[in-house]
């Protein structure tokens, strides 16, 4: 839209026609206070804090509902306006409890900030304040009614943003109160003899984060600490494949540091302010008492704690001996889709350059190999997460973004609501997003191949898709191999993305945790990286074939990093009875319990590096916390290679640069590291890196991995995401005979079956949801 020119407090400003006055002023650094206004939600005009004086208007106007107009003259700060805002605050504070010293919102409360600014420090009410008992609506949502200022942000966020409508308003006028969708008499939840109202929703906590005061508080955070007592670290969520940025609130404890809160209130990252229940609450797996904190070695049939040196020496010596006695091809390596790109790259390099084997794989939750192969040489492209939020048309084939990729579902809903995007769905079951769909094509459970063929037929669904000038196609893990390739061929000029299940599923494939391709999906024969590694040119065993070989007594050793194949694939533990097994993980999983050596590993919140989400968006992972007794997977791989007698300088190109101590000891706390980094950058130099620093291998990734050669190092280290696409040719794909290599995790909003089973809060939420479901069924009877 064309720009209009207007004046605010004597300044001449411009903004696109139709822009709300409040947003236009904000973009020019002019603050107008507001409680009820929230970007992306419908306009409420309930709080009257944003009132301004507009020339030729008879009374004060709300800036949150007034669009800018040509020639408009506005005053945002005057004695009249200040008095109006002060009067509004006095009304709000009239019955607001003086809980600031104990309220979780203290220090972050918008009401607190505005009270200090506009001077409503004394109440002109003599009557005692009304008191109401705090209500527990779910394990993660608590409501304190007297604190509520009736801005209705929570109601609109739940209905418009999340499409849940679990919150509403009871009564009218001054008697209005926010209430959950399950009243006390129907909830079936009784505490201390009193029936409690309950929330039947996705437990995302978005209502809590949008609340400007402390009326809604989090069950994981309440009464534990203050905002100024925590370090706030921006990193990437460790759960699904969407790649949400999360800001973790961390406090020091005796055995390292403890994560106390997860949110993204600064709205940075591709997810804005959105986080699902896993991103917001399921960080507590890191503090689980079952975390491994000491290496374990099997002695007399039992795993017992030992020193790091004993465990590493035994594992390294045994692995080296087995390689020499039975050959490199008798050893297998299984990686993880929850470890960083740098760790995944290093692990496959360890397998190929140290062990000398291509027997390497990971739990694949989507067929990225076929996606990369099928898009080569076509007019199709790789979609980014941001494309989903802006594209005029979206097709979902299989999958359920609401459960599997909540940010994707959020972006689709927002795009449909705000931009009128057209949503098409082809699925074998009803999914929540059908409510936003323009068209729905029912598919038989195993009939996606037939659906792909129908796209070439003369039917309304197919004609609508082919008529879309710009189409984003999101593909569930029901499609793989030939069916996936056929879908891509059937929709030329579209952009495609796969819905994978874990934080770095795409990165694990991109970095070469595969038996038949190298990093960047390069061929085992003739590529630059193949000659540099000196790796074998014959494809290795995939994950399932490794266990077949183990059962046949042909796999002498198996090194498992951050994976639990015994549980995930339902493998008979007896298959490993004659295989030397090394496992590094956070917990004593079903696979780790069978191991000869177990190394306690750090999780994604306890390390630095990068991850690539399902769309190919590369993001920085920052170390937020520590756990005593654990080490990063990167360090463990390097130390294991060292204890095998391998020259680790050929594994990790560390040590280049000027000094090794800058930024690692005193510089980290004095600010000297930052100054030194700036000086080195200005002189086109880099600091010397430790062999355990994941960024020591970033240059090699840039040099050797097609697609990642386009990454901008400074942009990555600054925390900005970058959309990368594979750039290799001559790729391979999973054949029809190996479809079982892609195994969906049967993910849902409340569990992924791996990390979340160690999250007490998510387990509590899951029990709550089960109780709600049972209660509804009983009510229906």
Tell what function each PLM region has.
Residues 1-3, 11, 16, 102-122, ...:
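Feature of Fe-S/electron-transfer and energy-metabolism proteins
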Residues 4-73, 79-84:
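N-terminal cofactor/phosphate-binding cores enriched in small/glycine residues
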Residues 6-7, 70-76, 192-193, 232, ...:
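Short beta-alpha connecting loops at secondary-structure transitions
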Residues 12, 166, 247-249:
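Short, surface-exposed charged micro-motifs
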Residues 48-238, 242-244:
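Fe-S ferredoxin-like electron-transfer domains
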Residues 93, 97, 144, 150-151, ...:
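Catalytic alpha/large subunits of respiratory electron-transfer oxidoreductases
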Residues 98-127, 626-723:
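N-terminal leader/propeptide and maturation segments of large enzyme subunits in energy/redox metabolism
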Residues 385, 606-628, 641:
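Glycine/threonine-rich phosphate-binding loop and adjacent beta-strand/alpha-helix elements that clamp
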